[in-house]
Each structure stands twice: as C-alpha cells, then as structure tokens.
Swiss-Prot record:
One of its GO terms (biological process) is bis(molybdopterin guanine dinucleotide)molybdenum biosynthetic process. Belongs to the MobA family. GO terms for molecular function: GTP binding; metal ion binding; molybdenum cofactor guanylyltransferase activity; nucleotidyltransferase activity. It is found in: Cytoplasm. This is Molybdenum cofactor guanylyltransferase. The N-terminal domain determines nucleotide recognition and specific binding, while the C-terminal domain determines the specific binding to the target protein. The keyword Signal does not apply. It is an enzyme of class 2 (transferase). It catalyses: Mo-molybdopterin + GTP + H(+) = Mo-molybdopterin guanine dinucleotide + diphosphate. Pfam families: NTP_transf_3 (PF12804). Keywords: Cytoplasm, GTP-binding, Magnesium, Metal-binding, Molybdenum cofactor biosynthesis, Nucleotide-binding, Transferase. Its EC number is 2.7.7.77. Its cofactor is Mg(2+).
Length: 195
C-alpha cells in the first residue's frame, strides 16, 4: 500500500534557455506552465509544495505553499530536492519539474511500486532517464546536503551513488517532454489546439 507522499514541483532554476524568463510562469494557452503540472501532479500526492527561488508571490497565487532552496546559489534541481526533503512531513517525497505539462498520471504509483527496497527511484522511458522525476526517502536529506556542500551538482551521479532504482515507463516518452525554449512552448500549444 502506498503511504502519504509529499509532491514537490521543481521551479527553482534560472531558465537560461527561456531567455531568463521564469519557465514555470510561461503562459500556455493562457495558463502558466506550472499550473499544468499542478493539475496532473496534485491528485497523485497527499501534500504539494513548489520549490521556487524567484517570483514566489506569483507561484503562491496558486494556493500551493512555496519554499526556496536552503543551499543557495541556483545550484540546480538537487538543491530543490534538498529543500523538499527538508520541508516534508511525510517519509517519502516525489519530485517533478515545472516544465513538463503532460507528466504521467501514474507517475507516483509507478515510482512507488518500482522502487522495490531502494530509498530512491527515478523515471526512465524507452529512450532515456528522467532523473528530475524522482521519489526519495527523507533519510537521504543529510547525504544530499553533503553532496551539494562538496560542490557536486550532477543529479544522475547522486542517484547512482545512492543506488536509486530505475523505473521503466514504457511507451510514455511523450509524457516526459519538457518545454525548454519558447519554440517548444509554441509547438506544444499547436499540438494541443490540433487535438
């Protein structure tokens, strides 16, 4: 049986490929990108929080609590994961980036079932790993902080170092498509209008 799990939307990055515009706030069909993630993610978790390091007031308008990085300096998704592990009142925390509007509706249940005895798991489709879609036990918080303090930033290296379980999401590569550029957003909107 799946326990209560806290969900964390990772929106703390610099969005350099979006020209510095806060990626989660980019409008898609009149709705901010992160709101699509909330709509898909919230039904899967018992508690939801957004990790953001700027424009926090705009994220708070969603009614979802907003937390910033404890380890500062825009050090990447691992800093947001550390903040989420520090915030959570549940034993397990699941993460999703703010730029994947079609994330799988079974993300959390699949990660939970696929983790086996591991303290962490991450998504992998037929083509590649998606380490920002990860489930972690809060006991990893100290190990993650130590990793970041040493200056390490690579998410996959951290997941490998803790023996995270890779969980296969076959036939779902399109659900993990992230929108990194304005052109990606335009293409996504065109596809939605064509459906």
């Amino acid at each position: 049986m799946q326990p209560n799990i806290t969900g964390v939307i990772l929106a703390g990055g610099r969005s350099s490929r979006m020209g510095g515009n806060d990626k989660g706030l980019i409008p898609l069909n009149g709705k901010p990108l992160f709101q699509y993630v909330i709509d898909r993610f919230k039904p899967q978790v018992s508690d939801l929080v957004i990790n953001a390091n700027r424009n926090q007031g705009l994220y708070k308008e969603s009614g979802i609590p907003v937390i910033d990085d404890i380890i500062t300096g825009f050090v990447g998704p691992l800093a947001g994961m550390h903040a989420g592990l520090s915030y959570a009142s549940t034993e397990w925390v699941v993460f999703a980036p703010c730029d994947v509007p079609a994330l799988p509706s079974d993300l959390v249940s699949q990660l939970w079932q696929g983790k086996k005895q591991a303290l962490a798991a991450y998504a992998n489709d037929d083509e590649r790993a998606h380490p920002t879609f990860a489930l972690m036990h809060i006991s990893l918080k100290t190990q993650l902080a130590d990793y970041l303090i040493r200056g390490d930033r690579k998410l996959m290296l951290f997941l490998d170092s803790i023996n995270a379980q890779r969980v296969k999401f076959s036939g779902k590569a399109d659900l993990f498509s992230n929108l990194n550029t304005p052109a990606d957003c335009d293409l996504w909107e065109q596809k939605r209008r064509g459906q």
